[in-house]
Amino acid sequence: MISIREMTAADEGAVMEMVDRFYHSPAVEHEVDPAVLRRSFQAAVDPAEPLIQGLVLEEDGRPVGYHYMCIGYSAEVGGRYLLLDELYLDPECRGKGYGERVIRWAMEQHPECLRYRLEVTEGNRAARLYERMGFRYLDYKQMVIDR
């Protein structure tokens, strides 16, 4: 069974190894500077940073995944939304219902949110889970400028 707990600075080694695996998987379509990924980890464990929360997912006391949740406001929904960002599980832990449990837990922790949002790449097998849970596609293409 999976357990969910807040990420701490002591998790840096284990989490950053999983972050590296996530960013070198088909779930990500572009390269991200490792310094940016480390900065995101630091923000996720900083209690003074209200916009991101990091979770460590454990099976039998061993880290097997991580998840970042990010809060935002959307004019389109007239309220807050929760970005379910970077949900990663080790391959041997997939297909056990852990992803659904983590997503439901995150949604229960943030009932104030009017939308729960996530991103998937084309062909991501996890999309079937998300659709089963009630997520639907919005036909937007993202455009960004990074600074």
Regions inferred by a protein language model and the residue ranges of each:
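Conserved GNAT acetyl-CoA-binding A-motif
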Residues: Q109-T121
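Conserved active-site alpha-helix within GNAT-family acetyltransferase domains
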Residues: E100, E122-D139
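Conserved acetyl-CoA pyrophosphate-binding loop and the N-cap/start of the following alpha-helix
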Residues: C93-W105
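A short helix-loop-beta-strand connector motif used in the catalytic cores of GNAT acetyltransferases and
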Residues: A43-V56
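Conserved GNAT-fold acetyl-CoA-binding loop/helix
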Residues: M16-A43
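A short beta-loop-alpha structural element at the N-terminal edge
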Residues: S3-V15
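A conserved beta-turn-beta hairpin within the catalytic core of GNAT-like acetyltransferases
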Residues: Y73-L84, R94, L138
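Conserved beta-strand in the GNAT
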Residues: V56, R62-I71, L83, Y88
